[in-house]
A protein has these predicted regions:
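Conserved N-terminal Rossmann-fold NAD(P)-binding element of oxidoreductases
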Residues: 27-29, 52
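Glycine-rich phosphate-binding loop and adjoining beta1-alpha1-beta2 segment
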Residues: 46, 51-89
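N-terminal charged helix/coil linker that caps or initiates catalytic domains
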Residues: 1-26
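Aromatic pocket-lining residues of Rossmann-like dinucleotide-binding sites
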Residues: 41
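Short amphipathic alpha-helix with an adjacent loop that forms part of the alpha/beta core around
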Residues: 104-113
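Hydrophobic/small residue at the entry helix of a nucleotide-binding pocket
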Residues: 33-34
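E1/E1-like adenylate-forming module used to activate ubiquitin-like modifiers
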Residues: 116-156
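Conserved SAM-binding strand-loop segment of SAM-dependent methyltransferases
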Residues: 71, 92-101
């Protein structure tokens, strides 16, 4: 039977696809890195994804972020991304959380419930705290080491 993930299944196999479809992932950051990661997960057939970002789409995001268009300016990035994911993979459960992850807000998250954590945060303090917390819980974390807001890469 052909379905939206039949080609993925041909590449990785039925068991691996079912594992992806049962997975629960959280992504922190819905910007230039996180947006692409979230969309790739949806196109791979992820079962459940929580997306976290307190920011809204701005005009300056249009050159590099999937969700940024004139029509989405001033909307929460997580809400725009949730709508986009539902057009790609309607069976994916998406929880949109417009929260700024910081050491002070981390108690709002039970990170132990996730199969994987993706860190696409551009705040160094938050990034370090998230990595340390994930490691202490034994939850695998994939961390993007971008240089958001840096203009001279030799100083990163």
């Amino acid at each position: 039977m052909i379905n939206r993930f039949s080609r993925t299944q041909r590449v990785i196999g039925r068991d691996a696809l079912h594992k992806i479809q049962r997975a629960h992932v959280i992504v922190f950051g819905v910007g230039g890195v996180g947006g692409y990661a979230i969309e790739a997960l949806a196109r791979s057939g992820i079962g459940k994804i929580d997306i976290v970002d307190h920011d809204t789409v701005s005009l300056t995001n249009i050159n590099r972020q999937l969700i940024a268009t004139d029509a989405t300016i001033d909307q929460y990035k997580v809400n725009v991304m949730k709508e986009r994911i539902h057009t790609i993979s309607p069976d994916t459960i998406v929880n949109a959380l417009p929260i700024f992850y910081l050491p002070e807000t981390k108690d709002q998250f039970d990170l132990s419930q996730y199969d994987y954590i993706i860190d696409a945060i551009d705040n160094v303090t938050a990034k370090i705290d998230l990595i340390v917390t994930a490691k202490s819980l034994g939850v695998p974390i994939i961390s993007a080491m971008g240089c958001g807001n840096r203009f001279d890469p030799t100083k990163v």
